[in-house]
Every structure is written in C-alpha cells, then in structure tokens.
Amino acid sequence: MFFSKDLPSPTSVFTAYASMAGYMMMIRSMAHELIPAPLQDFIYRTLRSLFFRSSSSTLTLTIDDDNMGMNNEIYRAAQTYLSTKISPDAVRLRISKGHKDKHVNLYLSDGEIVNDVYEDVQLVWRFVTDGGDKKGGGGGVGGRGGGGGRRGGMDDDGKSEYFELSFDKKHKDLILNSYVPYIESKAKEIRDERRILMLHSLNSLRWESVILEHPSTFETMAMEDDLKRDVIEDLDRFIRRKEFYKRVGKAWKRGYLLYGPPGTGKSSLVAAMANYLKFDVYDLQLASVMRDSDLRRLLLATRNRSILVIEDIDCAVDLPNRIEQPVEGKNRGESQGPLTLSGLLNFIDGLWSSCGDERIIIFTTNHKDRLDPALLRPGRMDMHIYMGHCSFQGFKTLASNYLGLSDAAMPHRLFPEIERLIDGEVMTPAQVAEELMKSEDADVALEGLVNVLEKMRLKSKESNPVMMKQKESRLEMEEMRLKSDTEGSPRKNSKRFKKLVLFWT
C-alpha cells in the first residue's frame, strides 16, 4: 500500500523532467556536431532493425532507382504500377503536373503503404525516404524518381529513396518469376495509355521535340474503306509479331512508301498512324544532314516505338550513288564522307537496322517514278500506299467531318450529283475540304462544291490531249482560210479572227 507521503511532489517531478530534457537536448546537439551524418544514418538503421525487426517468415525486397549507375527498370515499373493502386484511405500523397502532362499525377509520400494481392498472396508496398529533411515520394507516372526531381538512388540533398516489397518467404519464387514481370507488363500498358506523343525535328543535328497534337485519325481520313482497313490490319499485325520477327531473323521494323499528288493526305496519314499506335514521330530533313556518320548518330538517338518520316524523298536532297569514291586525306576506317544513299539504306534494312525495336519508317513522295530503284527494291519498303484524288467515299467522310452529314439515313439531295462529278482524278481531299469550310450551311457548301467540280471537269476536258489536238487542227484550218481569203473585207476577216480567239480561249 502506498501513502501520499511516499509520492514525489509535482515540483520535484517537473524539476527532474526539465533536467532530463535539458540533458537530452545537449546530448543531441553534441551528437549532431561530433558524429558524422553517414554514421548517424548507420546507427539509426541499426537501431531500427533491432527494435522493428520483421517476422522471420517475412521477406522484404528493396527496390532502388539506382542500378549500378543506371536507372532500375523495376523501380520505374513499380512507380507507375503503384500510381493506380493508391488507397482512398491514404493520408499523405503528393501531386505533380509537368508542362507536357495533361492530367495531375498522384504518387506516394514517405512512409505511405499500399496493399496488393497477387494469386491470393498478400503483398505490402512501402515507400521509404532515408536522410535529408525534404520528404520524398513514389509511385509517380513519369520517368522521374519518387520525389519527382532525381534520376538516381540519391538526390541532391543526399536523400535515398526506394520501395520496400514485403511478403511471405515461401512465395519468393512466385513473386520474382511471375509478379515482377506482371508489374512490368501492367506498367507498360499504363504508360502507353498515358503517353504524350512528341514530334521531334532537327536543329543543328540535335532532336528538338514539341507535343504532337495532330487531330488526324483513321476515322477522319478521306480514304477508301478497303485501303484504310488494309493499313490498320497491317499495323496491328506488325505490333503483335515481335516473336515472329525474332524467329525469322528480321529487325522489328516496318517500312511504308506514301506516294501521290500534293494535298492527298500523306502527312495526315502519318499523324493518324502515330495516334493509332501511340508512337512518337521523328521528322528527318535530309538536307540538314551532311555525312553518313551524322545520320547514323541521329537515327540511333531515336526511341523505340516511334515513326521516322522522310518527306519528299525524291527532292529532299541529291544523294550520291551508293558506290562512293574514298575521300582524299581520310583514313579508310573513318566515316567522314558525305551523306550517301548507301548510308540511308544501311539503316533501313542493313546492319544498323537492328538497332532498336518497334520502328516504322515512312517515305513520302509526289513522284514515285523519280525515286532511285534501290529505294523500290522488294522488301525495302514493305507497303506502297497510293494516296490519290478524292473519291466519293472520301467525300462522304469529309462531309461528315466538316458538315455533320451522313448518308446512313437520308443522303443529301446533292450527293448523287457530287458522286457523278467527283468520279475520276478531279479534286484532291485538301481541295474538297477547302470548299466545305467556306460555309457552315450544308446546302451552300455543297452547291459551291458542285460548281467547282463542274469547272474542274470542264478544265480537265479542255486539257485533254485529244481535244487539244483537235483544237490545234481547227486553228490551223482557220489561219489558212484567213490567208487565202484575200478578197474578203477587213471587217469580215476581223470577225473571223475574233471567233478564232474566242474558240481558243
């Protein structure tokens, strides 16, 4: 039994607490001044492992971004995957939004835990920040580190950030051989969905990029349905045949040659392909490249899952013949010669073509007949796509895009007339689109298109070689008649000459 006289007084308790707090503050200050920071971290981790040792049946994997000086792909995959697993009950999160991002990104802050289940196995993810005063974060969807600003396992403040994955030891093989590949696969799908397409162009032999926001899609392309379907099926087949290309010993790439008159949608088709596949686009201007070595360096700097476009390949640059004379004063092993056709072809289907996966190479030209035969060799450009004048099917697509018209229920009264007039090589899709944009009223826009089509067809007939020959023959006959009619009055000859001029014009 205790008596009140045995208890210390409140004053003595407060005095003892104040003395102890003072000693603790003094010891802490001395420790910070005398013990180096790395040793402090070591002592902290040791005490933490002693007092907070996990169960002997639990295995914890540490996933750091630093992989022997290189980025750890598993860390990046976990970062992306966990961004979709954040619990609504989370109490500490961080957000970010880069200038290229379309949405706000959520990611974990220091100490936050995410629970996951894989094949009935319970897993616990935890993001940890060691050292430094600034809190880190993880689970972001970008390619940056957990805190949003570092690239390695430790940031500029000496702060180490990593993920901890804890689970029962007996499931180690399942986690390493099945769960980790599953995370990498899911992260790739998430990045593809959220990927911001970029358009890269040359500036002083360096790639500069801007966000690609071209609205063209296969749904809005003024193409024949059969051709559109063939292109989509070819792209799908290319994407899913990675193992096939490896088995047959070919580089995982695809080449397309787009040819046809100007204004037929070649550039729009490139943008539609990029939007469909979620591929970046590299616009290569060969006139800016002086040597084969520069071309090789530029092409090696392109990313996988990208489209390389060389527009107007027939007139972009005059490429020398593939058999080049060695440059005087240069060693044979140096690649300092001028840009050659062989250098370009070597990257298309030569030894350098194997550098990179999921690459699409597109050449465009207005004049296929002017191309070097080496570019048209079978197997070099896998698919030749003719982008011709606007057909009635293409017109209906444009009418739906620009005027909201559809022939599914009740076609417009002018559709039959337009179908008759647009048949043949009369107008390009760009010309048709220009006419449809002149008015928001469908009747006015289509009537204007009919008038233009009639004029274009008349002009086409007049420029027909057969008709031109007939006109020239009649002109010669009229001239001979004027010369031979010397007895005719000047007024009569003048009238005949006026008729001749009117006929010719």
From Swiss-Prot:
GO terms for cellular component: plasma membrane. SUPFAM superfamilies: P-loop containing nucleoside triphosphate hydrolases (SSF52540). It is found in: Membrane. Residues 137-151 have a biased composition (Gly residues). GO terms for molecular function: ATP binding; ATP hydrolysis activity. Its EC number is 3.6.1.-. Keywords: ATP-binding, Hydrolase, Magnesium, Membrane, Nucleotide-binding, Transmembrane, Transmembrane helix. This is AAA-ATPase At5g17760. It comes from Arabidopsis thaliana (Mouse-ear cress).
